[in-house]
Amino acid sequence: MLDQHIADALPKAWMRDDWFACDAQVIRHYQAKAAVVAAIQPKTGIEIGTRCGYSLLSFHLASPQTHWLCVDGWVDSDSMQCREHWKRLVAEWTIHAHVMRIDSRKLTELPAADFAHVDGDHSYAGALHDLHLVADVPTILADDCDNASVRQAVEDFCASTKRKAAFTDDGLRQLAVIT
């Protein structure tokens, strides 16, 4: 039922003319991410790298009671459109979310949470920094682990914090659930 709900909602919620097209493979990617949130039903969540809010919407469909803190510097060429789209999704779907518009690399700490989604800076240093920002969060979902720099950051983070990562390939990208 959750998978179908996401398959129905995402295409309608997609930003018009987004360079990142919504297709069946992309929908499966968001379904895989939402399944992690559905399994744990967090009260609070942190999302580093929220962009247009597609993951946030998928997480909301999986766990509508979760309160989210989203962090994004919105520094790309399409960032203003993405930010406005994010605001519309949050309002339209009544998502409990607050945003910090800041480059996560400028942060030294974030509040406690039950779940974190790390999908911000995809450089090794940026991904590792973001993971350390949420090091005390019990379950971390790291996206884009098919990117060698991100995967290495996840592996090094897990080695230094004595945590485990379960890597999965959703057909579009590789995800890591860190516990």
Role assignments for model-derived ranges:
Residues 19, 31-179:
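S-adenosylmethionine/decaboxylated-SAM
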